[in-house]
């Protein structure tokens, strides 16, 4: 199946941190990330967050941290590919989800390398393009293109949310729809 299913999804948020968003159009990427995280919380979709060297780059930005589900795991990392961190492959596998929805900073480095590794592990990987960013538009474009060429499905916030909902009869429809108005 090529559409997202809330029961089979895990959200992986990559490095949306205090010092990394400063060089970006942070209002857009943070607001989009908040929408996906809020929808995941409403739909009981598990969320894992990574932080690249938080001692130097700061923690996850507060507006995003404020909407994360209570059981969200925040994983410190130094590898660009999050799956290279000790126990990360096992942590993701422990959720038993086949679809990984990934987004964050920087598109062409950490998001790209992690998405490639997830594909190699056999996951269906969906990148939320409008919730990703790079300091440079060219690198952003190349990162998205490289992921797509590798087999990652490129999506956006609204597509993901409405695929998770499936229809207006979903009991969480109004709550999730309100996130994009």
Show the residue positions of the predicted features:
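Generic N-terminal amphipathic, Lys/Arg-enriched alpha-helix
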Residues: 7-22
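A positional/architectural concept
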Residues: 19-22, 28-50, 54, 62-66
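Active-site loop/turn elements of alpha/beta-hydrolase fold enzymes
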Residues: 16, 52, 130
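Active-site-adjacent betaalpha module
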Residues: 1-10, 43, 55-181
């Amino acid at each position: 199946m090529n559409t997202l299913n809330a029961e089979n999804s895990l959200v992986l948020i990559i490095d949306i941190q205090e010092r990394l968003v400063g060089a970006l159009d942070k209002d857009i990427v943070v607001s989009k990330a908040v929408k996906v995280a809020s929808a995941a919380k409403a739909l009981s979709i598990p969320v894992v967050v990574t932080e690249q060297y938080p001692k130097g780059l700061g923690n996850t930005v507060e507006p995003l941290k404020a909407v994360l589900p209570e059981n969200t795991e925040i994983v410190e990392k130094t590898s660009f590919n999050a799956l290279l961190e000790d126990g990360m492959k096992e942590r993701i596998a422990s959720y038993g989800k086949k679809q990984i929805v990934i987004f964050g900073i920087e598109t062409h480095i950490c998001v790209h390398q992690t998405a490639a590794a997830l594909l190699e592990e056999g996951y269906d990987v969906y990148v939320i393009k409008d919730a990703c960013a790079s300091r440079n538009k060219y690198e952003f474009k190349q990162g998205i293109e490289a992921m797509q060429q590798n087999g990652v499905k490129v999506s956006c916030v609204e597509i993901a949310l409405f695929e998770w909902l499936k229809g207006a009869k979903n009991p969480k429809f109004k709550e999730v729809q309100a996130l994009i108005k």
